[in-house]
Amino acid sequence: YHLTDVQVAFSPDPEYNSISEYLTSYAAEYLEGIIKSGDIIGISWGTTMHKTVSKMNHLDIKGVEVVQLKGGIAYFDVNNYAFETLTLFAEKLNTKAKTFPLPVILDSKIAKDLVVEDRHISKVINLGKQANIAVFTVGTVQSESLHFRLGYFTESEEKALKENAVGDICSRFFDENGKISDEEINSRTIGIELEELKKKEKSILIAGGDRKVKAIHGALVGGYAN
């Protein structure tokens, strides 16, 4: 997979909840060891990210910038932990976060193109591109996937994603070869492009468990994490 660093967290219990606890504890410790003053850090959202950030200690560093890598507003009353993750992460790094006060996927490319032209939104997007560290997880295309519970997709779109994709990074869905699985949905997605992740000094994927194996493989084949 051409990775520069791999960390493996062991869970004595094969259940996903146990794996998630050990994984996020290890990830929190790992992030504490690599973040330094002056870093620009882009971060995604989701349960894994929230657990990881919650377990981090407050770091005595300065001049760090934290930016959200994708929109975070949900259409349904399901918590994606976007705001909580971002603000808590920034607080532990003695800074304020730059946010996307928007849904991550809009109904049309026209709407998305108009939104990203806004100077405030474009500033956040550009800061995400400038980030030297990106921290994210992979989602799955199983029915219980957070994206499918947040109201972003029609039934036909959800069906197509389940058939053609293996997972997502920053709400950009890819197939087993790491290629974008639906260009139309991708064109309406607000946030960092997957190709931008390849340029990062540290592109950090935090994920584990049987349910995410295909998504992890696709992400690594695509070269989105190093």
Listing of model-derived features with the role each one plays in the protein:
Residues 1-109, 213, 221-226:
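N-terminal active-site beta-alpha-beta segment that forms phosphate/nucleotide-binding
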Residues 72-226:
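Conserved phosphate- and dinucleotide-binding cores of soluble alpha/beta proteins
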